[in-house]
Swiss-Prot record:
Record-annotated disulphide pairs: none
Protein name as annotated: DEAD-box ATP-dependent RNA helicase CshA
EC class of the enzyme, as a word: hydrolase
InterPro entries membership: DEAD/DEAH_box_helicase_dom (IPR011545), DEAD_box_RNA_helicases (IPR050547), DEAD_helicase_CshA (IPR030880), Helicase_ATP-bd (IPR014001), Helicase_C-like (IPR001650), P-loop_NTPase (IPR027417), RNA-helicase_DEAD-box_CS (IPR000629), RNA_helicase_DEAD_Q_motif (IPR014014)
Annotated source species: Staphylococcus saprophyticus subsp. saprophyticus (strain ATCC 15305 / DSM 20229 / NCIMB 8711 / NCTC 7292 / S-41)
Stretches assigned to the Helicase C-terminal domain: 214-375
Family: Belongs to the DEAD box helicase family. CshA subfamily.
Purpose: DEAD-box RNA helicase possibly involved in RNA degradation. Unwinds dsRNA in both 5'- and 3'-directions, has RNA-dependent ATPase activity.
Length: 506
C-alpha cells in the first residue's frame, strides 16, 4: 500500500489521517485521490468496505474553500449511508471551518432548511429529499463544483435512476467535477456515465479483490420445511460474532426475527415498513454489540456500513447475482475473513449456477451440521456462560436453595440435570414460519415448483403454517402487498461431498 502523503494531499490532511489511524491508502484510494485532486471525473468500481468514502472524501475536503455556500453535493442510496458519509467527511475536515449537512426523508424538512440556510459547504443526501430541496430552492447549485454519486447501482436498484439524471442535469457539466462509485456497472449506470460525465478515468479494484477473496462462500441444499432448523443449527455451531440474515419478504423478516428471539437469540429485523427512529435504534444496538443477529430485506440493508460482521446467511436465495454480491459484501471487510452461506432448495440450484458463472468462482457445498455437532457446540457455549456466571454475586435465597438441593442430590447429577435443561431448552420452543415458494428456474421470478403442503418441524424447530389458505392466516396462497420479493418499493443437484461441516472453521 502507498502512504497518503505520496498521493499529493496537504500536510494538514496527512496529520488528520494519521490521527485517525489511517497510515496507508487502500487500492481505490491510491488510484482515485490523485485523479480527484487534478479535477478529473472518476468512475470507480469497488465494493463497500474498500475505502470508497476516503477515495472521494479526502480530495473533496482538500478542494473545498473556507467560504459559505454549497460547493459539493453527495448522493447516497439510504439515510444510513448518507449519515455515515457525513460523519467521515466531518472527521476528515477536523479543525477546519467546513460544515457538512445531511438531507434525507423521514425527518422534518424544516430542520434541514434551517441547516441549509447556514451556508454549509457540503451536502450529503438521498435523491428524493435532494430534489425536494432543489424544487423549494432551499438547495442552490450555483457554487457546486463537485458532484459525487456513492453506490450508484444501489440507487438505480431502488428506482432513483431518473432522480439521479434530474439532479445531474441541474448542475451543468462544465461547472462540475463528477465522481461516481458503484460495485457493479449495469447498462443504466453506463448510460448515465456516457450522458453526464466528461471523459471519466476508470478506477477498478474489483478484479484484484476477487482474485484474493476474503469471503468463504458456501451453499447448503435444504427443503423449505427444514430450513429454520438447519439455520439455527448453523448458528449454534458457528457462534457468529455478528451476523446478517437476508429474507426475501417483509413478512419473512418479521417471522424470522420473532422465531429467533423465541429461541433465545438476540435478534432484530429491518425492512421497508420499519420507522426511521426504530431503524436507527436497531442499527445502534447492532453496532454496540447489543445484538448478535440482524435480519433484513435486500433494500433495508442497502447502504449499511457495519464493521465486524463475521457471517452472512442467505435464508432465502437472492433473485439475481448483483443482490448476492451486495449481500455477501457485508462481511469479509478490512482484511478480515468472512463467511457467507446460502440456503437453497433443490429446485433452485439453477440460481447457484448463475451466481457462480457471473462471479467466475464456485461456491462450496456444505452439509448441515449433525445433531451431535450442535449439542457439542451448545455444551461449549453453556460452559463458557457458566464460567461467567460464577464471577457474579448470587442472591442469598438462591444460595439457600442450592444448599438444600446439594443436601438431597449428588452434586454431579444435580449440575448435569441443570446443564441438560439449558442445552436442550431451545428444542422445546415451537415457532411458525409462513411457507414461501422456492424460486422457479426462470430468471427473477417466483416459481410454481416446490412442495405443495406445509407441515411441522419435528426436530424442535419451526412449523410452517399452511392452514386457512383463504382466510389470510398463512399458507403460500396468501399473497399480500408487502410479501412480494423485497424491492420494498414499487435442477441440477450438486454433490454434497465437497466440504463436510467439520471442515468449516469459524
Amino acid at each position: 500500500m502507498q502512504n497518503f502523503k505520496e498521493l499529493g494531499i496537504s500536510d494538514k490532511m496527512a496529520e488528520t489521517l494519521q490521527s485517525m489511524g489511517f497510515n496507508e491508502a487502500t487500492p481505490i484510494q491510491k488510484e482515485s485521490i490523485p485523479l480527484a485532486l487534478e479535477g478529473k471525473d472518476v468512475l470507480g468500481q469497488a465494493q463497500t468496505g474498500t475505502g470508497k468514502t476516503g477515495a472521494f472524501g479526502i480530495p473533496l475536503i482538500e478542494k473545498v474553500a473556507d467560504q459559505e455556500g454549497v460547493q459539493s453535493l453527495i448522493l447516497a442510496p439510504t439515510r444510513e449511508l448518507a449519515m455515515q458519509v457525513a460523519e467521515s467527511l466531518k472527521a476528515f475536515a477536523k479543525g477546519q471551518n467546513i460544515q457538512v449537512v445531511t438531507v434525507f426523508g423521514g425527518m422534518p424538512i424544516d430542520r434541514q432548511i434551517k441547516a441549509l440556510k447556514k451556508g454549509p459547504q457540503i451536502v450529503v443526501g438521498t435523491p428524493g429529499r435532494v430534489i425536494d430541496h432543489l424544487n423549494r430552492r432551499t438547495l442552490k447549485t450555483n457554487d457546486i463544483h463537485t458532484l459525487i454519486l456513492d453506490e450508484a447501482d444501489e440507487m438505480m436498484n431502488m428506482g432513483f435512476i431518473d432522480d439521479m439524471k434530474f439532479i445531474m442535469d441541474k448542475i451543468p457539466a462544465e461547472q462540475r467535477q463528477t465522481m461516481l462509485f458503484s460495485a457493479t456497472m449495469p447498462k443504466a449506470i453506463q448510460t448515465l456515465v456516457q450522458q453526464f460525465m466528461k471523459s471519466p478515468v476508470i478506477v477498478k479494484t474489483m478484479n484484484n479483490e476477487m482474485s484474493d477473496p476474503q469471503i468463504e462462500e458456501y451453499y447448503t441444499i435444504v427443503k423449505e420445511l427444514e430450513k429454520f432448523d438447519t439455520f439455527t443449527s448453523f448458528l449454534d455451531v458457528h457462534q457468529p460474532e455478528l451476523a446478517i440474515v437476508f429474507g426475501r419478504t417483509k413478512r419473512r423478516v418479521d417471522e424470522l426475527t420473532s422465531a429467533l428471539i423465541s429461541k433465545g437469540y438476540k435478534a432484530e429485523g429491518l425492512h421497508g415498513d420499519i420507522t426511521q427512529a426504530k431503524r436507527l435504534e436497531v442499527l445502534k444496538k447492532f453496532k454496540n454489540d447489543q445484538l448478535d443477529i440482524l435480519v433484513a430485506t435486500d433494500v433495508a440493508a442497502r447502504g449499511l456500513d457495519i464493521s465486524g460482521v463475521s457471517h452472512v446467511y442467505n435464508f432465502d436465495i437472492p433473485q439475481d447475482t448483483e443482490s448476492y454480491t451486495h449481500r455477501i459484501g457485508r462481511t469479509g471487510r478490512a482484511g478480515k475473513k468472512g463467511v457467507a452461506i446460502t440456503f437453497v432448495n433443490p429446485i433452485e440450484m439453477d440460481y447457484i449456477r448463475q451466481i457462480e458463472q457471473a462471479n467466475k468462482r464456485q461456491m462450496t457445498a456444505l452439509r448441515p451440521p449433525h445433531r451431535k455437532e450442535v449439542l457439542k457446540a451448545r455444551e461449549n457455549d453453556i460452559k463458557g456462560k457458566v464460567q461467567n456466571w460464577m464471577s457474579r454475586d448470587n442472591e442469598p435465597r438462591l444460595q439457600r436453595i442450592a444448599t438444600e438441593l446439594l443436601g438431597e442430590y449428588n452434586d454431579v447429577d444435580l449440575i448435569a440435570s441443570l446443564l441438560q435443561e439449558l442445552v436442550e431448552s431451545n428444542d422445546e420452543v415451537d415457532v411458525q414460519l409462513t411457507f414461501e415458494k422456492p424460486l422457479s428456474r426462470g430468471k427473477g421470478r417466483q416459481g410454481k415448483g416446490g412442495p405443495k403442503r406445509g407441515g411441522n418441524h419435528k426436530r424442535g424447530g419451526g412449523k410452517f403454517d399452511n392452514k386457512n389458505r383463504r382466510s389470510g392466516k398463512g399458507g403460500f396462497n396468501n399473497k399480500k402487498k408487502n410479501d412480494r420479493p423485497s424491492s420494498d418499493r414499487n435442477n441440477n443437484k450438486k454433490s454434497m461431498k465437497g466440504r463436510t461441516f467439520a471442515d468449516h472453521k469459524k
